[in-house]
Amino acid sequence: MEVQLGLGRVYPRPPSKTYRGAFQNLFQSVREVIQNPGPRHPEAASAAPPGASLQQQQQQQQETSPRQQQQQQQGEDGSPQAHRRGPTGYLVLDEEQQPSQPQSAPECHPERGCVPEPGAAVAAGKGLPQQLPAPPDEDDSAAPSTLSLLGPTFPGLSSCSTDLKDILSEASTMQLLQQQQQEAVSEGSSSGRAREASGAPTSSKDNYLGGTSTISDSAKELCKAVSVSMGLGVEALEHLSPGEQLRGDCMYAPVLGVPPAVRPTPCAPLAECKGSLLDDSAGKSTEDTAEYSPFKGGYTKGLEGESLGCSGSAAAGSSGTLELPSTLSLYKSGALDEAAAYQSRDYYNFPLALAGPPPPPPPPHPHARIKLENPLDYGSAWAAAAAQCRYGDLASLHGAGAAGPGSGSPSAAASSSWHTLFTAEEGQLYGPCGGGGGGGGGGGGGAGEAGAVAPYGYTRPPQGLAGQEGDFTAPDVWYPGGMVSRVPYPSPTCVKSEMGPWMDSYSGPYGDMRLETARDHVLPIDYYFPPQKTCLICGDEASGCHYGALTCGSCKVFFKRAAEGKQKYLCASRNDCTIDKFRRKNCPSCRLRKCYEAGMTLGARKLKKLGNLKLQEEGEASSTTSPTEETAQKLTVSHIEGYECQPIFLNVLEAIEPGVVCAGHDNNQPDSFAALLSSLNELGERQLVHVVKWAKALPGFRNLHVDDQMAVIQYSWMGLMVFAMGWRSFTNVNSRMLYFAPDLVFNEYRMHKSRMYSQCVRMRHLSQEFGWLQITPQEFLCMKALLLFSIIPVDGLKNQKFFDELRMNYIKELDRIIACKRKNPTSCSRRFYQLTKLLDSVQPIARELHQFTFDLLIKSHMVSVDFPEMMAEIISVQVPKILSGKVKPIYFHTQ
């Protein structure tokens, strides 16, 4: 789509007419004067005025036909052309005399079936005859664009400088430009004949600039004035010499229409590229180009407007004249490659006055025309990354598709760096894209059948991901999301071709490869990333498995001394010190606790020795021992293992037990229902965080499925908090009050004030049971761990079998703790019965509290009780499952 810059906004190109401003001719003429100072003769042939319509050009050609022939004859004879007086709407400048060649009648293309007039060419992508620029006479309204400082849309600027300022100012309107254009068409022929009859040889340039001696200086001053009025910088025009070459990205840069003597060198291959594009496009039929006309037409037509006669194109090469572009040079084509362009300067952010009213909305098939501010220097990383872009295509960035959507020959593809960001799927948004032989958007002409072979060794197949080896960039640049960045193949720059069969079932051009959906097809993560051997305590490099955990030598020695010694370590902080390689010696208490959490035990080495001894003895005495002796030996070993494992398990439970958590309640404020319940909710939020950490540190808990871990914690958190609060009340206040936290203790008054007196009474009774049964700390720790595995969904967990085994192991540990201090089996059974009954009594209390908290959450906005986010989520999602019977506790005894 060709976008024209308007005053303060951007207008799209109308479907039938292109509005072009006069600043192109202004800047072009000023540029030529700056680069070629001194008196020159006007050029013999030039382009028709860009603002004139097709009918006006035909009428002007018919009126001036005799004089054009006379001019051509004079050019053939070699007679010098004198200065002619141009129309009042032009400011004629002296230029270098160019020999004019006779214009040959163009031959009509046999496939087009049209008979164009002399000077007419077929517009690319449309098949419509377009008037070629004809050499005008001195009295023609369409003065040569190379001799004019302003186009025909400004007919009165040569006689009055005030009009120039008015039109160039932002206050000028499009209506004034249209009126002046109509006046120029009507008055051009009569004024030209009058000047020819009078024989006045003087040019309006002399009247305006004051003589030929000051042409260069006046042009520079005028150019500076125009730049200042339009908000442009004028530093680019300072210290310009005749042979100085301007930069290609500047608006005053010389283009292909400039004579070869002053044309910059980088533009020579560009002219050949554009000329080859015109040669290929001129030979194609209308039917071939109709498919991708919205893309090809905008690009090729713009090249025809520039009249690239220097490369021998079919459209403009027959005349043999150098003609200036009629489009704005600010719209840089995709083939430009300027290495010396300023990357930080922007010459495009300024308003341009357009000759015409604001055009209508864009047509359904706009011409694709991309304005690029920087050179097209995209490396291989961009070409590779474009594979993921919804508009990108690797085949269209390089290789056969590099010549542009309208290119149909390999030569054009090789000489151009055109690329497109439009794919065939976006036809409804950006115009119909080429398909088949013509092929737009990455399927260019000659390589459309066999597929474009890019320098990267990759061609995009019709379906899925092709496994073609070649010079790819780094795989982590273009791999789809969810795929690991390292590949286990010999060459890191190739794609595994075996991926194709199982990737066809996924959606998307490359397959929706995610670890969740393709877990069965992707190797384990340890295959790509070898496990790091680091110490589980401090993170230093581990030296081996010591005392049941992978640790370094320093932590190994520390644990041996700390566990065997009788010294008690206390943390000066809150039992949450950071233990790493540099700070592991700061807090021995937290370091020892972390050792227990990692599973380090002094009995691990003894158990290993006992196990090896057991296997050795069984192997030696397998043939000599009797069944009775063998059974007794197994019982002895199991009895030793039981006594050895008992302190290990208790040491772990003691090390991971959470500390005291405060509720943050303000006891200076009067007690109220909202304040007490809000403090309880805040305390529950803080304790829930500690419960999660404690549960993850329990032996065997991490072996559960992740979903089972979350479910077990979310269902049992209320019972765990009630059981722990009862123990704190028993140890701190002898079960006379409810010791929720050091700053939140409930007495009788607060129990009534909180409107949960019945629940508080039952919790106080539970706390008193600890005293009546004389529960030991070891029994409490084991019972609390067993309480975590005492409530599950009715439908079961995802790994119910492992959950049952883990629960049974904790029951056995509780039985071992009971049997540790009691030698009488009868007393052990009685004690086990008492402790399990106490565990069963926790479940009804937890259910009542679930119902209370759920009702409170529903009407919390009415009673002004605050619920933390995590508490509100668990109560609203998980508690209804318990209340509805979908989740039930596991009882030891029949209720």
Curated annotation (Swiss-Prot):
Q: Please indicate if the UniProt record lists Lipoprotein as a keyword.
A: yes
Segments forming domain NR LBD: 644-875
The Gene Ontology terms for molecular function here are: androgen binding; beta-catenin binding; DNA-binding transcription factor activity; nuclear receptor activity; steroid binding; transcription cis-regulatory region binding; zinc ion binding
Instruction: Give the start-end ranges of region Interaction with ZNF318.
Output: 1-562
Quote the protein name from its UniProt record. Answer: Androgen receptor
Q: Name one GO biological process term.
A: negative regulation of extrinsic apoptotic signaling pathway
Compartmental location? Nucleus; Cytoplasm
Return the annotated site residues (Interaction with coactivator LXXL and FXXFY motifs): 696
Similarity-based family? Belongs to the nuclear hormone receptor family. NR3 subfamily.
Q: Which PROSITE patterns match?
A: NR_LBD (PS51843), NUCLEAR_REC_DBD_1 (PS00031), NUCLEAR_REC_DBD_2 (PS51030)
The ranges of region (Interaction with HIPK3) come to 547-637
- For bias type Polar residues, the affected ranges are 201-211
- Region span, Interaction with CCAR1: 567-894
